[in-house]
From Swiss-Prot:
It is a single-pass type I membrane protein. Residues 525-576 form the LRRCT domain. The chain crosses the membrane at residues 585-605. Disruption phenotype: Animals with a double knockout of APOE and TLR6, fed a Western diet for 12 weeks, have less aortic plaque formation than single APOE knockout mice. They also show lower serum concentrations of IL1A, ILB and IL18. One of its GO terms (molecular function) is NAD+ nucleosidase activity, cyclic ADP-ribose generating. This is Toll-like receptor 6. It comes from Mus musculus. One of its GO terms (cellular component) is membrane raft. Keywords: Cell membrane, Cytoplasmic vesicle, Disulfide bond, Glycoprotein, Golgi apparatus, Immunity, Inflammatory response, Innate immunity, Leucine-rich repeat, Membrane, NAD, Receptor, Repeat, Signal, Transmembrane, Transmembrane helix. It is found in: Cell membrane; Cytoplasmic vesicle, Phagosome membrane; Membrane raft; Golgi apparatus. Residues 606-795 are cytoplasmic.
């Protein structure tokens, strides 16, 4: 039986004991060693190795049959002890003699038949319910428990003065277990209940209600009844039982849970509470049996403000829906909540209704609900969460005549906005609209209440916000989390937006001008998006750094790079890219400036080190080597005595003798000089012609003095005619000193033409360049050339 009782009082224990438990545990919540849990361990006795400083001990759901003083006497700091769901038959409160700080004691759901009491001044919570007591186990010592706030008891029968010892206490909660209660001979018993805020009565779960006890309580705020089974015959017995309990003016809240009854009896119960002072009637786990017919109901003036029915099972499948729904629709109360039921519809009140709050969560309502209804003028809040709504525009049309509606919740339906026909009819009074967890797309923004302040669209199918959206100038909070948006929406159409939730979307490159567009934003939640850490993201991260830290929710932990792979998982706060790699203009200017600097530097170095001269000389050397390898065979077979004939002015003889001859002759190059090799007795012209013919090449040392010499011109003339032919390159010009073309006499047209057509070697004034000059000059001679000695020629 204890297993059946467990769920019955779960919620009551939670409500009544939560404050006490939290208050008791908070001072030592951080001391893990002071909380010991041995529940559900199949223990038959209390463990011996408990820590001496234990403050909270749970031994529930075991097989302990006895509690002795040595078991807990050493736990001097014990404040909470749970022994529920064991096999204890007897309890002597003297075992707690050394536990003077004990505040919470739960020995419910045992087999207790008797107890022995002693003073326990600190006790606040005492639960003796769901045991095997014959009469209420209330000792006179209980009257000294001045701190007691919760008292749980059970008995098979009552006596009027059983609770007299605790009548003067100010209790918050009293739990009476009446599961084992039975009447004898149809007699009616009486019981005076002490003053308490909450009275919870638990009846047998499988028996028809049969309690005949006149209970009276002077000050009661909340009455809770559990396990009520009724039919049409004993329905009146429950109302008789409740008559005395509900008489007091302080009773404002009545809760019935786990109730099985007929529809006729249900209507009678509603009618019973209608004239009573009860303001809040709550019914949980209602099962309707037998038939459902239209029942008469008198909607007189009532103190009832709210009727809440949650979790209804209807065992009647064929019935008049009008008979069922009209009873609720015509109630003249402010708040009606019917949730988790098989109801498929709710009719429109036939006359102007008093409803300001309607909650129809988790039913089977369709798009036809309240269509064309014009009697809900006072309705301020409508909740249709978890139903079968599909057409978004019909939902809008449903609200058209609800002129006071401020809050509408149609989340967790199957709403879609595909069939947009530009007919958008919302109640203009709507301020809060919850459209989350539906199948809406971006077109929903074309049809929204114009004055909405809070809009929840999270978990839909929105990929983008259209440009032609409804201008929602009053919108302050927008939740579009868990959609497929790729960018942060600007505030062009939402000028008053202050809160934006857009996490868990597909935002990879948030707009850098978001914060400029949304000047009033005070809370942004945009984490858990696949941010691409590229140049486009730099400005957004920079803008985040400019706003207050509390504005960006979840920063920086929820803002991480998703791409590229090398940066995946990196916090945006730690992501950095150089300005140069992200600014195209700056990059272009930098590259251009660098190239310009390099060009200027290169030009300067070229000029400073005379690089063009080196290049020119290298090209000449290369060409000379190439031509030397392709000398015609007939050139090599000529009878030659000299490698070179040198023509120069007497003014340049010092350079020829000191520079030219030593550098050529050291490599066995035979040179012909007129003053050294001309044959005396012959004319100068004959010697010139003769030795030019005997030389492989002719070298002319050009200078301003050269062009002033007639003989030098003759030598040049004869060399040009004798050594030059098509394809040959045996004339070498060395420019010792610069010669301007204008300074060459016109009669020396040969020289002028040669200098214009032929490449010549310039004598470098810098000594560092002279090595390349000599290498270039020597490369012009074929070292394997077979020369004939002068003596051999004579013979």
């Amino acid at each position: 039986m204890s297993q059946d009782r467990k769920p019955i009082v779960g919620s009551f224990h939670f409500v009544c004991a939560l404050a006490l438990i939290v208050g008791s545990m908070t001072p030592f919540s951080n001391e893990l060693e002071s909380m010991v849990d041995y529940s559900n361990r199949n223990l038959t006795h209390v463990p011996k190795d408990l820590p001496p400083r234990t403050k909270a001990l749970s031994l529930s759901q075991n097989s302990i049959s006895e509690l002795r003083m040595p078991d807990i006497s050493f736990l001097s700091e014990l404040r909470v002890l749970r022994l529920s769901h064991n096999r204890i038959r007897s309890l002597d409160f003297h075992v707690f003699l050394f536990n003077q700080d004990l505040e919470y004691l739960d020995v419910s759901h045992n087999r207790l038949q008797n107890i022995s009491c002693c003073p326990m001044a600190s006790l606040r919570h005492l639960d003796l319910s769901f045991n095997d007591f014959d009469v209420l186990p209330v000792c006179k010592e209980f009257g000294n428990l001045t701190k007691l706030t919760f008292l749980g008891l059970s008995a098979a029968k009552f006596r009027q003065l059983d609770l007299l010892p605790v009548a003067h206490l100010h209790l918050s909660c009293i739990l009476l277990d009446l599961v084992s209660y039975h009447i004898k001979g149809g007699e009616t018993e009486s019981l005076q209940i002490p003053n308490t805020t909450v009275l919870h009565l638990v009846f047998h779960p499988n028996s028809l209600f049969s309690v005949q006890v006149n209970m009276s309580v002077n000050a009661l705020g909340h009455l809770q009844l559990s396990n009520i089974k009724l039919n049409d015959e004993n329905c009146q017995r429950l109302m008789t039982f409740l008559s005395e309990l509900t008489r007091g003016p302080t009773l404002l809240n009545v809760t019935l849970q786990h109730i099985e009854t007929t529809w006729k009896c249900s209507v009678k119960l509603f009618q019973f509470f209608w004239p009573r002072p009860v303001e809040y009637l709550n019914i949980y786990n209602l099962t309707i049996t037998e038939r459902i017919d239209r029942e008469e109901f008198t909607y007189s003036e009532t103190a009832l403000k709210s009727l809440m029915i949650e979790h209804v099972k209807n065992q009647v499948f064929l019935f008049s829906k009008e008979a069922l729904y009209s009873v609720f629709a015509e109630m003249n109360i402010k708040m009606l909540s019917i949730s988790d039921t098989p109801f498929i519809h709710m009719v429109c009140p036939p006359s102007p209704s008093s409803f300001t709050f309607l909650n129809f969560t988790q039913n089977v309502f369709t798009d036809s609900v309240f269509q064309g209804c014009s009697t809900l003028k006072r309705l301020q809040t409508l909740i249709l969460q978890r139903n079968g709504l599909k057409n978004f525009f019909k939902v809008a049309l449903m609200t058209k005549n609800m002129s006071s509606l401020e809050t509408l919740d149609v989340s967790l339906n199957s709403l879609n906005s595909h069939a947009y026909d530009r007919t958008c009819a919302w109640a203009e009074s709507i301020l809060v609209l919850n459209l989350s967890s539906n199948m809406l797309t971006g077109s929903v923004f074309r049809c929204l209440p114009p004055k909405v302040k809070v809009l929840d669209l999270h978990n839909n199918r929105i990929m983008s916000i259209p440009k032609d959206v409804t201008h929602l100038q009053a919108l302050q909070e927008l939740n579009v989390a868990s959609n497929s948006l790729t960018d942060l929406p600007g505030c062009g159409a939402f000028s008053s937006l202050s809160v934006l939730v857009i996490d868990h979307n597909s935002v990879s490159h948030p707009s850098e001008d978001f914060f400029q567009s949304c000047q009033n934003i005070r809370s942004l939640t945009a984490g858990n998006n696949p941010f691409q850490c590229t140049c486009e993201l730099r400005d957004f991260v920079k803008n985040i750094g400019w706003v207050a830290r509390e504005v960006v929710e979840g920063w920086p932990d929820s803002y991480r790079c998703d791409y590229p792979e090398s940066s995946k998982g990196t916090a945006l706060r730690d992501f950095h890219m150089s300005p140069l790699s992200c600014d195209t203009v700056l990059l272009t200017v930098t590259i251009g400036a660098t190239m310009l600097v390099l060009a200027v530097t290169g030009a300067f170095l070229c000029l400073y080190f005379d690089l063009p001269w080196y290049v020119r000389m290298l090209c000449q050397w290369t060409q000379t080597r190439h031509r030397a390898r392709h000398i015609p065979l007939e050139e090599l077979q000529r009878n030659l005595q000299f490698h070179a004939f040198v023509s120069y002015s007497e003014h340049d003889s010092a350079w020829v003798k000191n520079e030219l001859l030593p550098n050529l002759e050291k490599d066995d190059i035979r040179v012909c000089l007129h003053e050294r090799n001309f044959v005396p007795g012959k004319s100068i012209v004959e010697n010139i012609i003769n030795f030019i013919e005997k030389s492989y090449k002719a070298i002319f040392v050009l200078s301003p003095h050269f062009i002033q010499s007639e003989w030098c011109h003759y030598e040049l003339y004869f060399a040009h005619h004798n050594l030059f032919h098509e394809g040959s390159d045996n004339l070498i010009l060395i420019l010792l000193e610069p010669i301007l073309q204008n300074n060459i006499p016109s009669r020396y047209h040969k020289l002028r033409a040669l200098m214009a057509q032929r490449t010549y070697l310039e004598w470098p004034t810098e000594k560092g360049k002279r090595g390349l000059f000599w290498a270039n000059l020597r490369a012009s001679f074929i070292m394997k050339l077979a020369l004939v000695n002068e003596d051999d020629v004579k013979t």
